[in-house]
């Protein structure tokens, strides 16, 4: 079954329903009876779930007197975290639990010594935890192509179009009928700029290519392809260039922003931006910070073409080198993945929970999921998801950065989308 079908099934079900192990394990620690301290690395900035991370860690520490979790925020999203992890492991200072982005799954599997979660849960006396609480298709999000379970899905998100209904009304647009295609987005952005003086559109510019993948593949392009069994850049096509050029043209005519996320998101929250295309994971931050009613609609399509949106977010990996730390890490993961904790995480961010039945659990976020139209819409979007492209090999991080650099070149008008993507594909293929 294809990923978009199995993930759709997973989300429908969600609504209805002391041995040392692992690749990086090389020693045991004596059971001294002392408090075990573990590090939890994440990418949740204060404006993106940071407060919820602190709340969850504090709750866990209160209820687990023999374990102390120390959380550490890593800037620059998953690329920044992965680079920091690489440096830490090279110096022998492994963190214990890490939020790894789905786009770095292949890189992490091939370049890091990680703990085998199946064996780790077995050692903790709960070998059926994953099988009992997650559909096989959801677990696949954190599996390599050869079926290795290198982590446990934690956060799931989709890209959506947030908009300001008050700006829409001032511009003569209907808030109940937001843009459904990129042609309509372009026209609406220009109309907002011309009639209100506000900027019309902004697409997130994190240190990744998540929304850009959605853009490219929804127009019939692809991020990666295989040639003679080898992975190659697949975005050097007319379809990919045309998709990217849509956003570049909006920036060129002055109706869209090319800016940092902080600038773009703040413009939206302050009522100076009509539309922002970003993760549903920003829902809670937007709804809390805006003085207007935050509304969201599905990721726009290219004409009648079906949209293809990568499942964003992260999965949890364990890198503990000490048996007691490893055991504590598994205990912490079980807490983070509990219905109660997932409810707090989803409520505090906007991420969709991966565990079966959380939305129907009275300890889960059933009430919020039933009442919040933005959440309902995001859950329905799960029928369209594809896998987030992950560059393989030792040069995966460099390849990812080259494509990020291409985004800046295109949106700044230094080069056309066609030329920039062509040159970038050539560079990436040499690396891969």
Where are these regions (language model features)?
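Extracytoplasmic/periplasmic substrate-recognition and gating elements
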Residues: 62-63, 68, 87, 91, ...
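Glycine-centered hinge/linker elements that transmit conformational signals in sensory
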Residues: 186-191, 229-258
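C-terminal capping/gating helix-and-loop segments adjacent to ligand/active sites or protein-protein/ligand interfaces
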Residues: 310, 373-427
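Extracytoplasmic/periplasmic solute-binding protein
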Residues: 144-154, 159, 169, 183-232, ...
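Mature extracytoplasmic/periplasmic domains
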Residues: 44, 59, 114-122, 281-284, ...
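Hinge/lid segment of periplasmic solute-binding proteins
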Residues: 102-158, 186, 194-196, 214-215, ...
